[in-house]
Structure formats: structure tokens, C-alpha cells
Amino acid sequence: MSNFLSIHQGIQRDSDQIFIGPGSKELLYQSVLIFEGHFIIPKGSWVSYIPQIKSKGGTYSVLETALEDNFKLTANCLEAYLSESLHSEHILVLNSPNNPTGATYSDVEYESLAAVCRKYKVIVFSDEIYSQINFLNAHSPSISKYYSEGTIVFGGLSKVFSAGGYRLGFMSLPKELKHLSVVYSSLFSETFSCVSSPVQFAALKAYKYSKELQHYVA
């Protein structure tokens, strides 16, 4: 998984910074439970983000996006919100390529957003479940390239490899948040034991990402 992230998404994470679970939805939800802070959701987002936050009694704001920006959150919009926010800690949930809009953030857009997130010490949940599905570019960028220290990356088998029934997801912590590994491990051990063995074998084949498989996916 570490090699896959490095080669295909430009994300440098060691194996001990990566967790595997029964789907990225589960790992996202566990992260929502662990982090205390005010959540920021760009308008036009996956259906489960807000219900997950509500289920823990968390607070959130939905930031407007516009057609002229291809329904993507802009750095100016994020800066304007954070500069007036009364909350001390924030978690931004980004999804690119996006469900439901299909929009994909560019390197330039991510670099601008990263600068704002760094300024305000925002934690980013980067949902990259569709990372290899991009019909416009050779790859979909990751905000972790520009803001590694504050970005937790999520992904999984279901979308990229057309394997919705194979429940396996991953999340990767930056080294700056590696101290949370103990917290995650404790929560994971009390909520799920492991991913089923047959699915793990399928994932091993998928994440080796042969040229034949890459052609099929791309």
C-alpha cells in the first residue's frame, strides 16, 4: 500500500502510518469520532459525511461552492470563513474526484487551499476513493502533496477497482499525527477485528497495480 500511494498518488507514507479496515466509510467514521473540532463540508458532497458528524453530536458548517468554480471550494472562500470562525479547531473534509459533482481539484487549487489550511492549522480528511478515476488527466492530485503534515488520506477498493462488495479501505496518517496511531488502534480493536482474508488477497493483487490492471482501471 505504501508503494502504491507513492507511485500512483505521490503520497509518501510508511507502512506503519497506514491502517486497513472494512471500507473507507468505516475508517472515515472512526476518524470523525476521534477528532474534536468543527467540521467544514464544501457544498456538493458525499451523502454520509454530515450524518456521520451528526451521529456523534458534532458541529459542522457547509461552505457554498459555485458553478463558475466547478463546484469546488476555493482558497478565498475557505479563508473568508476561517478568518471569522469562532471555533478553535477545524476539520475540512475534501473529496476529489468528487461525488456527486465529478469535479477534480488541480495542483494549483490544492496548493492554494493547503496554504490556508496551514495558516489556520486545519486538519484535512482527504477522501480519495475515486483517485484513479480521472478522464481528464494522467492522475488526480492529492492535497497531501502540499499539506502532508495536516492531511489524513482515505481510499479503498470499491470505486477504483469496481469492487463494491469487497469491503477494504485504507487511511494514512502523516508522521506529524502518528501519535494518534494508539488511539486509532484502540478504537479499531473494539469495533472491528480485521478485513476478511479473501478480500485481503484480492486487495494485495489490486494494489500491486500491474500494467494490465492499470489499463483496465484508467
What annotation goes with each model-predicted range?
Residues 1-21:
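Conserved N-terminal alpha-helix of the aminotransferase class I/II PLP-enzyme fold
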Residues 41, 62, 124-126:
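Hydrophobic residues in well-ordered beta-strands that form the structural core
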